[in-house]
Amino acid sequence: MSWVIVTGANGGIGAATVHELIKNNYSVYAADLADKPHESFAAYGDAIFRYRSVNVSDEESVRALARAAAEVGEPIQGAVLAAGIVHSKPLLDTSFEDWKRLHAVNADGVFLCLREFARAMIEQIQTSPENTRSLVTVASNAARVPRAEFGAYGASKASAVRVSSSFGLQLSRHGIRVNTVCPGTTRTPMVTDAWNGEDLSALSVAGSPETFRLGIPLGRIADPADIAAVNAFLISDASRHITMQNIVADGGATF
């Protein structure tokens, strides 16, 4: 059974991705900052699920994860990089510490994970002409358009998009594909926490002309499962001729 690494596995999109991959007969090496895995993973045995506490912004922590995943026995099929943090504040009010913290996780973490996972995969198999190995970065539609309150966040995600496509170009000769997924507003704990107890989904759907933000033409915010399905597709052989692409899954919010 093929193994896929999932970072940010305890988060909304990360957890949904773990479940979607296991449903599609992948084994998952899950990682998150927390000491213990999400309670919804309790039924999964060691044959299909492993967990490790990892700080994606720490080079040695990421390297140790790559080593551990490589030692499971089966080759690493790919990875979904779903670890991320959000920050909502105008740029004029954003501290340099906040800026660095966002980039440490959302940009540096993506670079470290892509580099270390790719190194481990190449060490296992130098090249795979079938192009079945895949790395997927979960970014954000804020990487594509300016957001009044998400300037620093969008910049960190834009960095993740660009470094992912650059890795995709360099790893193509090894038969490893690299793509990014850009969700829009998704009902995850990270998003609902940022709403401070209010349900702002209707506002997201309607848009905000005063902040030059379009609404969502499909009429709803995303569920984590919506994004997980895209992640699983990009991991699967069905996408073996897709690389260096940025797949936007935001209900049309950035058309």
Q: Which residues fall in each region the model found?
A:
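Substrate-binding pocket helix/loop in short-chain dehydrogenase/reductase
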Residues: 90-91, 98-100, 212
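Alpha-helical segment proximal to the catalytic Tyr-Lys
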Residues: 119, 169-170, 240
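Residue(s) in the substrate-gating loop at a strand-loop-helix junction
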Residues: 140
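Active-site helix of classical SDR
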Residues: 114, 156, 164
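C-terminal substrate-recognition "lid" of short-chain dehydrogenase/reductases
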Residues: 218-249, 254
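Conserved glycine-rich cofactor-binding loop
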Residues: 10-11
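Short, small/polar-rich loop/turn modules that mediate ligand/substrate recognition or access, typified
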Residues: 172, 177, 242-244
